[in-house]
Amino acid sequence: RSTWPREQQRVMVDQRRAGVVGLGLIGGSLGLDLQALGWEVQGLVHREVTAERALARGLAHQVSTNPSCLSGCDLVILALPIARLLEPDSALVDALPSTAVVTDVGSVKAPVLKVWSRLHPRFVASHPMAGTAEAGVEAGFSGLFRGRPWIATPDSQTDPLALQLIQNLAESLGS
């Protein structure tokens, strides 16, 4: 049960369309868990063959190689390698809705926060402390985050409601 005030709990309830960019271990696991919580999940991947496999595995309701698939999302999770977070594709940045909450799941925080806080007004740097040695579209599974810490690293410019949504997200996933 959440210990957050009721008006802050609503932040989670009102947001129900998520985009997951990258459907490897972390992104794929998020896609499965978010769907189990009732979210509509849009997946974005780099290659068509990956999109087909991710869809076949049920990692998202829809999977695309076109960043425009994120246009209606309330939440976008960047499950990308650190190098791609630090130098994001301009088509991805341009496709992010300005009202969406955007977070990453990378293990490096300060450089990612520095880059993304300039790129999106509702960015929250975060990192679930969960994983396995597996990688790629075959690696994701339900329940990866249960019982695992999930940290957020806001700065003074972080939107408090965006931060609250990420905290609620982590709690809803069992972190």
Predicted regions located by residue number:
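Rossmann-like NAD(P)(H) cofactor-binding subdomain of soluble oxidoreductases
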Residues: 88-139
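NAD(P)+-binding Rossmann beta1-loop-alpha1 motif at the extreme N-terminus of oxidoreductases
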Residues: 11-67, 71
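N-terminal Rossmann-like NAD(P) cofactor-binding module of classical short-chain dehydrogenase/reductase
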Residues: 76-77, 103
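Glycine-rich, N-terminal phosphate-binding loop of Rossmann-like dinucleotide-binding domains
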Residues: 79-81, 106, 154
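Hydrophobic Val/Ile/Leu positions in short beta-strands of Rossmann-like dinucleotide-binding domains
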Residues: 19-20, 78, 152
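Alpha-helix C-terminal capping/helix-to-coil transition sites in glycosyltransferase folds
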Residues: 71-72, 98
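Internal alpha-helical scaffold of NAD(P)-dependent oxidoreductase catalytic cores
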Residues: 144-175
